A protein has these predicted regions:
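Active-site-adjacent substrate/metal-binding segments within catalytic domains
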Residues: 37-130
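Aromatic-lined substrate-binding rim segments of carbohydrate-active enzymes
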Residues: 92-173, 248-259, 264, 329-334, ...
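Glycoside hydrolase catalytic-domain groove-lining segments
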Residues: 281-373
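Aromatic-rich peripheral "rim/lid" segments of glycoside hydrolase catalytic domains that contact
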Residues: 371-375, 385, 396-403, 407-471, ...
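Short, well-ordered beta-strand segments enriched in hydrophobic/aromatic residues
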Residues: 460, 487-495, 628-636
Length: 712
């Protein structure tokens, strides 16, 4: 009996394993077009080849049968909350857990941008040894991004960029084949990579999102001729930059073929800014000034694995995605405006090789960096919206005949900066804190949240608040306060019925006013912010006009808006709304129309519940009111606090002449109503040398899990 059971188990495992890449049973519900599911045998010319890129898709060598495999995966960043790119230091155990979760999400591919920690490859090897359905890897190869700006030319006289690129190519190939003990990685001088994972590698992607100016500078080398290599060659139309890429790709294929008798599909990264199309209604010249056309790079018969194209494609930027008429007017099969799908269809016509969307993502940050004409914004989305919108974008990708779609990203990373937030990074990454207003920090399917656990669930209940956190106990109110790395939390308990607005003044740097002329309230300390609570209307955080970074940056410094000189005067008694900038002025050439600069009120608070276990959970909300109890979580960034563990705040920019930083030891907070002279109480900020965090799977995870079942 035991023997029969064992045989049945083995047979079941074999069946499951084969089904990972077979396409014999494509159901009616499958998202992907039912075509080109297999190809004839591949002439491997004595090489080890597990994947080929051919026609529209990738094909996997399943015991000499070449079955189509749709690449559905996630981009994995290098870091966790308190590590940085120089020393990512993610553990083996964490990688093992992530691979399991990714596989259970019904994804089959992990994409990385560059060489990873040795523990990544060890965990990848160990996971795949035991997995019924091994994960595939898309390995990125880049060079120091600073070269894009410091050198600014791929064909510089000293060959700085080319040498760095070649070195990374060689190191990466050796690592993939488990033959490297010479690569410096973070704090590891000689990192050891000893597992050959090449059979799981579906492709290499060379390069970065190329700045237009970098490409133009390279193309100025008009004496650079087309490149003709052993495996790749340029067409006669190739630009100097495309010649450079061709050479780098040829060196990769040559090194791997000659050193390891292995060939793997290769692509060159591109993005919408340098795509091969012209976008006549793009308002910003630098977003449509130069093209990188990898169709000017061809493979010869010696390269059997095949080239593919890889592009990062987002729905909200560049602006032509919102304003190109033929894209906005396009209706998908559901009758919905779908500029993303229209662009995908337009783009794919440019290629004779399989095309992969190397990045597509939507952040659940509180802050918004760009707005989409159909609501697929860069930020400000709920986790449910993230999941639903991503499935819509992926459907457009797969239905349009793309070979794969890689979600950006698996985990949130706290080091990332966004163009419309004040940039700050502590010297010691171990005390880094999150900025929930930064869209770049909110893309992950894995939420990386402040604190060892969630210290306060905004739900209008006081069971999480202790007497030690009660800072004011008056005849009318109880005010509680606590904080973690991401937020200042407040709870208010009303002891009697209050019909009017309630005000909570907050002093951080202490450069604000001691009165509010509009609301008829005064304070015993200079107050930088006022939390204006309206139980029956809008609740918002206001800033003293003098301490408004929005007005200082976009009015006083950049002149985007007319500036009120009264805002540069201390103790004016003027408190203004907190705004977030999302777009400069735009002139649309096709429409002959100018759109004014765009911004929104980021200090307007949203009502809801932040308990992930509640069916009413909403990650974008700020406060909740239940009878006479109110709870708030205020992002530190809205208070100009850049790092709560160090008490780092934005300094007095008018006095300093620029945005810089200083440290404070305490906050001061009070509570009152119109006509009051409010007494402020001190809250000490305790210095921490090690920030804490916890992780959880966002609500989007389950949505994607159900969706990806249908992608075969």
């Amino acid at each position: 009996m035991k023997k029969i059971v064992s045989i049945m188990l083995i047979f079941a495992m074999m069946t499951v394993t084969v089904s990972c890449s077979k396409n014999d049973n494509i159901s009616e519900k499958n998202i992907v077009p039912d075509k080109e599911t297999t190809i004839e045998s591949v002439d491997m010319d004595g090489n080890n080849i597990e994947f080929v890129a051919q026609g529209d898709y990738f094909y996997h060598n399943d015991n000499k049968k070449w079955n189509r495999v749709i690449l559905k995966g996630v981009n994995m960043g290098l870091t966790l909350a308190t590590t940085n790119l120089n020393n990512p230091d993610v553990s083996y155990e964490t990688y093992m857990e992530w691979f399991k979760q990714i596989s259970e999400m019904n994804a089959n591919t992990v994409k990385v941008f560059t060489i990873m920690n040795p523990d990544f490859y060890q965990a990848f090897y160990d996971y795949n040894k035991k997995a019924e359905c091994p994960l595939y890897l898309i390995q990125g190869i880049w060079f120091n991004e600073d070269y894009l700006y410091d050198v600014a030319d791929a064909l510089d006289a000293d060959n700085i960029v080319a040498d760095a690129f070649e070195r990374n190519i060689t190191e990466t190939i050796d690592i993939i084949h488990g033959n490297s003990d010479y690569t410096s990685y973070g704090n590891i001088k000689n990192a050891v990579y000893h597992n050959d994972i090449s059979k799981y590698v579906a492709g290499y992607i060379l390069g970065l999102e190329w700045p237009a100016e970098f490409v133009q500078n390279t193309n100025s080398h008009t004496d650079r001729e087309a490149y003709f290599g052993e495996y790749l060659e340029n067409t006669n139309d190739a630009t100097p930059f495309e010649s450079f890429l061709c050479e780098m790709g040829d060196k990769l294929i040559s090194y791997e073929t000659q050193s390891y008798k292995t060939q793997i599909p290769v692509a060159f990264l591109n993005w919408q800014t340098t795509d091969a199309l012209k976008h006549s209604n793009e308002p910003f010249e630098e977003e449509d000034s130069v093209s990188v056309n990898t169709e000017n790079i061809k493979s010869n018969e010696s390269y059997k694995a095949g080239l593919f194209a890889a592009l990062d494609i987002y729905p909200y930027y560049p602006e032509f995605m919102n304003h190109q008429k033929e894209y906005v007017d396009y209706k998908d099969s559901n009758g919905q405006s779908n500029p993303y799908e229209a662009y995908l269809i337009d783009l794919k016509k440019e290629y004779t090789v399989p095309v992969m969307v190397a990045e597509v993502g939507l952040p659940t940050s509180r802050g918004i960096a760009h707005e989409s004409v159909v609501g697929y914004n860069q930020g400000g989305l709920t986790e449910k919206q993230q999941g639903e919108y991503l499935t819509n974008l992926l459907t457009s990708i797969y239905k349009s005949g793309y070979a794969g779609g890689m979600i950006f990203s698996w985990q949130e990373e706290w080091f990332k900066q966004t163009w419309n937030t004040v940039k700050y990074a502590p010297e010691n990454p171990e005390c880094r804190t999150p900025n929930v207003m930064s869209a770049e920090q909110g893309y992950g399917i894995v939420a990386v949240e402040p604190g060892e656990n969630q210290i306060c669930k905004i739900d209008g209940k006081l069971d999480e608040w202790s007497d030690s956190e009660n800072i004011i106990d008056s005849d009318e109110y109880k005010l509680y306060s606590k904080y973690d790395e991401g937020y200042l939390y407040l709870a208010v308990q009303l002891k009697s019925k209050t019909d009017g607005k309630i005000y909570v003044p907050i002093s951080t740097l202490g450069v604000g006013s001691q009165k509010d002329n509009t609301r008829n309230i005064a304070f015993d300390k200079n107050t930088d912010y006022i939390l204006e609570i309206d139980k029956n209307g809008e609740t918002r955080l206001l800033t003293d006009a003098y301490y408004s970074t929005f007005h200082y940056i976009y009015g006083y410094s950049k002149g985007v808006f007319d500036f009120d000189n009264d805002y540069s005067v201390k103790n004016s008694g003027e408190y203004v709304r907190i705004q977030m900038f999302t777009s400069n002025e735009m002139y649309l050439p096709d429409d002959n129309k100018t759109i004014e600069p765009q911004f929104y009120e980021s200090g307007l608070l949203k009502l809801g519940i932040t308990d992930p276990d509640s069916d009413k959970f909403d990650n974008t909300v700020d406060y909740y009111i239940a009878d006479n109890t109110m709870e708030f979580r205020i992002p530190w960034y809205l208070l100009n606090v850049m790092n709560s563990t160090q008490g780092t705040v934005i300094n007095d920019f008018y006095s300093e002449g620029s945005i810089n930083f200083t440290n404070i030891k305490e906050l001061n907070i009070g509570i009152g109503k119109a006509g009051d002279n409010i007494e402020m109480k001190s809250i000490p900020l305790e210095e921490k040398q090690q920030s804490s965090y916890h992780t959880r799977l966002k609500k989007s995870y389950e949505i994607l899990k159900e969706y990806l079942k249908k992608v075969k």
